[in-house]
Amino acid sequence: MVEATKKAFVTGHPIKHSRSPKIHGHWLAQHGIDGSYEAIDVAPQDFAEFIAALQANGFRGGNVTIPHKEAAFAVAQRRDQAAEEIGAVNTLWFEDGVLRGGNTDGHGFAANLDDCAPGWANTGPAVVLGAGGASRAVIQALKQRGFSDIRIVNRTLARAQELRDRFGAGVSAHGTAATDELLADAGLLVNTTALGMVGNEGLAADPALLPDHAIVTDLVYVPLETPLLAAARARGLKTVDGLGMLLNQAVPGFEHWFGVRPQVTAELRALIVADLVPKP
């Protein structure tokens, strides 16, 4: 009997911008797997119906992105520790007939820094700019790696305070007026906001205020070098762009669906970098 094609998906609304099919398609071809990974646009009101039909439609699981991560958290019958701590699911898979949910964003964040800035977890206090969903994943990863002084900076202080209360000891909340003071002894600066994206240029913090040993990373990857990273590089600081987080967060899901743990390679990165360049 010929085994059916292994199927996975990424769903969001909208979803046509997703680079995930290119990432997983590269790995499927590399490993010679008879599989598929498709982008499916699902409106919020149709999400529950979409999930209910996954097995009937032959899917082993898939990725979930904005705006469905909280809905995926609710529908998963079992959730991993990261998903519980973050309160959102970005990866779904079936195991013994049970729909399981995980969150690989924190893994992607930490693995990117492991690859590009070895020793990053021993640099001192971390300043996290922003208090949205991405910030939750970053804080979860930082706590897992042993950070005991995590400073959330957000324009709306109440949002930062919510995350402080969620993650507890070692996490503090601050308004943007405190940014300069917080940077003075920080070893890691993380931008989780949209500031720096194409069309939303600007600096959320001044890297010139950081110590010489500090590392600066930006979750934005379009452009690859944001104004924040450019300023940090000009200051002589170690910088890490956000593309590696996207690539590394995809690894656990691929293993769940297709049975092989793929590698994030220079070849894969080059493939996605080429796709980031605007088409004429």
From Swiss-Prot:
<feature type="binding site">
    <location>
        <position position="242"/>
    </location>
    <ligand>
        <name>NADP(+)</name>
    </ligand>
</feature>
<dbReference type="InterPro" id="IPR041121">
    <property type="entry name" value="SDH_C"/>
</dbReference>
<dbReference type="InterPro" id="IPR006151">
    <property type="entry name" value="Shikm_DH/Glu-tRNA_Rdtase"/>
</dbReference>
<dbReference type="Pfam" id="PF01488">
    <property type="entry name" value="Shikimate_DH"/>
</dbReference>
<keyword id="KW-0560">Oxidoreductase</keyword>
<dbReference type="InterPro" id="IPR013708">
    <property type="entry name" value="Shikimate_DH-bd_N"/>
</dbReference>
<dbReference type="InterPro" id="IPR011342">
    <property type="entry name" value="Shikimate_DH"/>
</dbReference>
<comment type="subunit">
    <text>Homodimer.</text>
</comment>
<keyword id="KW-0521">NADP</keyword>
<dbReference type="Pfam" id="PF18317">
    <property type="entry name" value="SDH_C"/>
</dbReference>
<feature type="binding site">
    <location>
        <position position="221"/>
    </location>
    <ligand>
        <name>shikimate</name>
    </ligand>
</feature>
<dbReference type="GO" id="GO:0008652">
    <property type="term" value="P:amino acid biosynthetic process"/>
</dbReference>
<feature type="binding site">
    <location>
        <begin position="18"/>
        <end position="20"/>
    </location>
    <ligand>
        <name>shikimate</name>
    </ligand>
</feature>
<protein>
    <recommendedName>
        <fullName>Shikimate dehydrogenase (NADP(+))</fullName>
        <ecNumber>1.1.1.25</ecNumber>
    </recommendedName>
</protein>
<comment type="function">
    <text>Involved in the biosynthesis of the chorismate, which leads to the biosynthesis of aromatic amino acids. Catalyzes the reversible NADPH linked reduction of 3-dehydroshikimate (DHSA) to yield shikimate (SA).</text>
</comment>
<dbReference type="GO" id="GO:0019632">
    <property type="term" value="P:shikimate metabolic process"/>
</dbReference>
<keyword id="KW-0028">Amino-acid biosynthesis</keyword>
<dbReference type="GO" id="GO:0004764">
    <property type="term" value="F:shikimate 3-dehydrogenase (NADP+) activity"/>
</dbReference>
<feature type="binding site">
    <location>
        <begin position="154"/>
        <end position="159"/>
    </location>
    <ligand>
        <name>NADP(+)</name>
    </ligand>
</feature>
<dbReference type="GO" id="GO:0009073">
    <property type="term" value="P:aromatic amino acid family biosynthetic process"/>
</dbReference>
<dbReference type="GO" id="GO:0050661">
    <property type="term" value="F:NADP binding"/>
</dbReference>
<feature type="active site" description="Proton acceptor">
    <location>
        <position position="69"/>
    </location>
</feature>
<feature type="binding site">
    <location>
        <begin position="130"/>
        <end position="134"/>
    </location>
    <ligand>
        <name>NADP(+)</name>
    </ligand>
</feature>
<keyword id="KW-0057">Aromatic amino acid biosynthesis</keyword>
<feature type="binding site">
    <location>
        <position position="219"/>
    </location>
    <ligand>
        <name>NADP(+)</name>
    </ligand>
</feature>
<comment type="pathway">
    <text>Metabolic intermediate biosynthesis; chorismate biosynthesis; chorismate from D-erythrose 4-phosphate and phosphoenolpyruvate: step 4/7.</text>
</comment>
<dbReference type="GO" id="GO:0009423">
    <property type="term" value="P:chorismate biosynthetic process"/>
</dbReference>
<dbReference type="InterPro" id="IPR036291">
    <property type="entry name" value="NAD(P)-bd_dom_sf"/>
</dbReference>
<comment type="similarity">
    <text>Belongs to the shikimate dehydrogenase family.</text>
</comment>
<dbReference type="GO" id="GO:0005829">
    <property type="term" value="C:cytosol"/>
</dbReference>
<dbReference type="Pfam" id="PF08501">
    <property type="entry name" value="Shikimate_dh_N"/>
</dbReference>
<dbReference type="InterPro" id="IPR046346">
    <property type="entry name" value="Aminoacid_DH-like_N_sf"/>
</dbReference>
<dbReference type="InterPro" id="IPR022893">
    <property type="entry name" value="Shikimate_DH_fam"/>
</dbReference>
<feature type="binding site">
    <location>
        <position position="65"/>
    </location>
    <ligand>
        <name>shikimate</name>
    </ligand>
</feature>
<feature type="binding site">
    <location>
        <position position="90"/>
    </location>
    <ligand>
        <name>shikimate</name>
    </ligand>
</feature>
<feature type="binding site">
    <location>
        <position position="105"/>
    </location>
    <ligand>
        <name>shikimate</name>
    </ligand>
</feature>
